[in-house]
């Protein structure tokens, strides 16, 4: 098998935000950092960095982003011990320095007519929309009284506290379930990578606009492995044309890594060339400055 050559990161560092597992004490937000984008070290001895106080007090699939004047985390508000159809909300946090998190908000999507009977609100992510000057939050959604499959829905917010009425963003032409969407903008195009729940692979669709329409194409599976994967996360190696995708090997355990330069054709990264060996589950990546990197290490090494 041909493997990709790791790219040389030019500046800054990387913050990986993730959770650990299906036990209540593992459904917590953890951090890891890297200087090269391939080899990661957990912070705080791989223990939670945020104490969730609202909602179920358990969260999964955390997504971290740099806002216009602060940082945000959005996550699935869910205690899996309550069942996989028990979740109908998300939880959000805000920070000025990546260390101290506040303004926690639990958002119940049963408060909206369009998701009043939702039994799955999973893996929220967000991207700033220059057209609306708001953040588009997108997530996997299923309404229990609907014959429609799991699909990707979206809502808009300015403050991660109040949200617009959710609507469907993308569903597969196959009519089968899709989850775990991750949208990456490059060269004016929006690339959505998502899990096909039928075959347990990562597929790809493209749009000219953040809020769609996302177009599927033939042979759009991009994951390089036949093992079951989900929780895909894509990020750029700074100063290069290389984009890395990491995926949760949720059946076998561990993580799978692959990379691309054209957003469509990937090569796997050899296991010897990356390190994510602290049992992370579905997470997200944030580019950080050297100053932010060293402050995180200093704070969580106490």
Name each model feature, range by range.
Residues 1-302:
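Carbohydrate-active catalytic/glycan-binding domains of CAZyme proteins
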